[in-house]
Amino acid sequence: MARFRGSITKVSRRLGIALSPKAEKYLERRPYAPGQHGQSRRGKVSEYALQLREKQKMKYLYGILEKQFRNYYKKAVAQRGVTGDNLVKMLERRLDNVVYRCGFSPSRAGARQLVTHGHMLVNGKKVNIPSFLVSPGDQIEFRQKSRNLDAVADSLNKVPDSRIPEWIQVDKANRKAVFLAIPEREAVQEPFNEQLVVELYSK
């Protein structure tokens, strides 16, 4: 699957959100957009620019390119309920996102690598597709030979239990987790406004 290969730190500074642990540290030192005029940019931002910015936040946070993101939006529209809520719920069900939420990786990019490299099992079967949608009751775990990866142990040691959401039950010792439920929108604490994205695509 194609993925973004540019500077995540620069994108983080432009959007004002941390897209990786490294970017988070960088933003603490330079909390403004990159470039010569990063600290002095002012002026009224157009409605379109605001909508586009929120879309970029969602795409980069979940590591999704435009074509796939638009497909998620179309599916969200076709479902019952609030389109924006449906969109967020689908993104939260992605396997790479769930692996990240479990604390098995400090970033979604790292979680995506764990999936694509074949380290993860879902209900006992290997799944190497990051966009695989996890369902309530699914068990996510590492393959036997992957359970002692140093990077995973390091991530679990650093990730506080408070970061693991209530809709996932994690067994750190055995490198396992159960996806208990699809989260409600208000439970997902991410710095974006999906309603502006819906307005953008509705035009």
UniProtKB/Swiss-Prot annotation:
GO terms for molecular function: rRNA binding; structural constituent of ribosome. The keyword Oxidoreductase does not apply. Residues 93-154 form the S4 RNA-binding domain. It comes from the Bacteria. InterPro entries: Ribosomal_uS4, Ribosomal_uS4_bac-type, Ribosomal_uS4_CS, Ribosomal_uS4_N, S4_RNA-bd, S4_RNA-bd_sf. GO terms for cellular component: small ribosomal subunit. One of its GO terms (biological process) is translation. Pfam families: Ribosomal_S4, S4. Keywords: Ribonucleoprotein, Ribosomal protein, RNA-binding, rRNA-binding. Belongs to the universal ribosomal protein uS4 family. PANTHER family: 30S 40S RIBOSOMAL PROTEIN, SMALL RIBOSOMAL SUBUNIT PROTEIN US4M. One of the primary rRNA binding proteins, it binds directly to 16S rRNA where it nucleates assembly of the body of the 30S subunit. With S5 and S12 plays an important role in translational accuracy. HAMAP family: Ribosomal_uS4_B. Part of the 30S ribosomal subunit. Contacts protein S5. The interaction surface between S4 and S5 is involved in control of translational fidelity. This is Small ribosomal subunit protein uS4. It comes from Chlorobaculum tepidum (strain ATCC 49652 / DSM 12025 / NBRC 103806 / TLS). The lineage of its organism: Bacteria, Pseudomonadati, Chlorobiota, Chlorobiia, Chlorobiales.
